[in-house]
Amino acid sequence: YMIDFKENKEASETLINISQDFIDKKDVNKVLEKSELNLKKINSEIKKNKILLCGSGPSIEGFDINFENYDVMICNSIVKNKNFLNQAKPKYLMFGDPIFHPGPSKYAEKFRDDVRFLIEEYNTQIFTLSRDYAIYKNVFENKYLNNFSFVPMKKTKEYNGNLLENFYIKGTGNILTLLMFPIAYSLYDEIVLAGFDGRKKEENSYYWKHSKKNQYDDLLEEIKFIHSGYFKKNNIFYDQYYENHLETVKNWIDLSNTSNKIIKSLTPSNIF
């Protein structure tokens, strides 16, 4: 059952975890050391004191700002939006989903092609999970992997807002709290957000709405077929997920208050 990807929503992540048994641990350790050094190098070269985190909610479509005032961090399928990329010229891309990014679907394949484009056009720095290194090592060419930093997850109660000091993240179920906040907190004192709309609590048929410009809508049915177990979730699941997400965001906001970080959303949000 644990690897039955047609019935079990956790099967894809289980299969990824199994893939770690087929790679040299010394290789992984070298990659982690390189990734940690890369983060410190990035920190030493930062010239702007504030960062803009961009989510894929509908509010990002009408967002108007002078991107040149910020270092820009994007996530997930925003990589498909070439017009937005041309304006924002993102410095960072974060992703870490077990099916949409390292998976065998055409959706994941198109996503990875867009990651290649992003690196070629903007030399964007990529942060993702060390969990997925064994897969990405085999699907990305070395010239692209040079822009990757792989971050390990650690089972801990505390959220880590300083990866320069301790290079790990606490596992969470959303890219904002999994990677975007940890990296942003580690490098910047002023953090502004756009496109993290969330949802009204009664709108519980899915996680939340996404901007059509930032989603591979034409490939969704294919990935739902391949990973059918992943999508066997009911309203109760989405309610619990959303409540957990709100609580996790609150914990990060609390951390900002004790670490002198400024956080604010520039677009309408049910989360902030």
How should these model regions be labeled?
Residues 1-272:
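Metal-ion/cofactor- or nucleotide/acyl-coenzyme-handling active-site neighborhoods
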